[in-house]
Amino acid sequence: MTHPDIYPQISDDESPLPDYWQASEGHTYCLVTDGDEVLGLWAFIKKNAVVWEIHTCILPKARGRKAYEALKLLPAWAWANLKGARRIVTEVPDYNRPALVFALKAGMDKYGVNPKSYLKDGELHDVILLGISRGEQCH
């Protein structure tokens, strides 16, 4: 998550790049690979008994075809590995169009907007809440 090509895209103005990153207890991580090649990481945070939040960190070299191939595997992996999961949600700042398109292609529906709730480059942005429920599939 601290990769120099990823961290600037997922951090707000008040989150400087840490010297190191330590996995948090209670989180579930899924390394996205193509053979031995690391493409990125999915981080899942349990929000309550049935909802998990996903954070997607795909390296620039993997964006496009490889990322979408991995995306097709995500729902089945999540339902099999995230205990009690009935819904997966994510929050995407409105300026991050590629992340929004990626979430929508994952089959996520737009649930709503949290207005002016993310500070990036000195500007406030809306945050879009999206999610997918068990039984729904990638588009």
Model-predicted regions and their roles:
Residues 10-27:
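Active-site rim helix/loop that mediates acceptor-substrate recognition in acyltransferases
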Residues 26-40:
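Conserved beta-hairpin
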Residues 36-46, 52-53:
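Conserved beta-strand in the GNAT
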Residues 49-61, 91:
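Conserved acetyl-CoA binding element of GNAT-fold acetyltransferases
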Residues 64-80, 101, 105:
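Conserved acetyl-CoA-binding loop-helix of GNAT-fold acetyltransferases
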Residues 81-92:
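Conserved GNAT acetyl-CoA-binding A-motif
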Residues 91, 109-125:
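Conserved catalytic-core motifs of GNAT/GCN5-like acyltransferases
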Residues 95-112:
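Conserved active-site alpha-helix within GNAT-family acetyltransferase domains
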